[in-house]
Amino acid sequence: EAQPFIEHYGVEEVKDFFAPLPCKLYQTTIQGTNGETSTLNVVLNGRQHNSDLVGCEAASVATLAAIQKLHPDIVVNSGTCGGFQSKGADIAKVYIGNACMFHDRRVPGDDEWGTQALGNYPVWEGAKALAEHLHLPMGKVTTGSSLDMQPCDLQIIQENGGELKYMEGAAVAFVCSLLDTPIL
């Protein structure tokens, strides 16, 4: 998923930046419209057992390591997700998330446990204005640890207004919320 982005921006790998973790850092300097330069960091979960690391655990580790070592102003979490046609989603349609939640954490008990399990993490306060400026739709991102979906997952997604299914989104938002780092 990241290869076109890496090639477009000409970012180069910073070897062993996160060692001994498998996460990878790619970095370059970009010039903003105001003439100031900024560092663009692209962090990938890495690989293990000859396979790309995917899912909540890998995303949480990579996000935690990145925030602790890089101290970003904002985390932009981009990737490929599934959507629901009934909500207007279509192949290759670009969205900006308006919130992130977990859809596969079924924790019985009182409201506090249920609220904590689902997450419902906010995104960066400028997300709506950015979406309007770019003429992009917004949607609630839901996350689960499996590529498939159980009927009870779909029920949670529908009950909470989920529109986009992305395996890492809420995990990244969770870590950002702990470290008070804005996420888009």
Report residues per predicted region.
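N-terminal short beta-loop-beta anion/metal-coordinating cradle
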Residues: 1-64
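Conserved beta-strand scaffold positions in the cores of enzyme catalytic domains, especially
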Residues: 40-42, 75, 138, 183
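Glycine-rich beta-strand-to-loop/alpha-helix junction loops that act as flexible
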Residues: 44, 78-81
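Glycine-rich phosphate-binding loop signature in dinucleotide/nucleotide-binding domains
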Residues: 66-73, 179-181
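Proline-aspartate-enriched helix->loop->beta-strand connector
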Residues: 71-76, 162
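Mid-sequence, gly/pro-rich, charge-dense loop/helix-turn segments that line enzyme active sites
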Residues: 80-164
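A C-terminal functional module that forms or caps the active site or interfaces directly
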Residues: 151-184
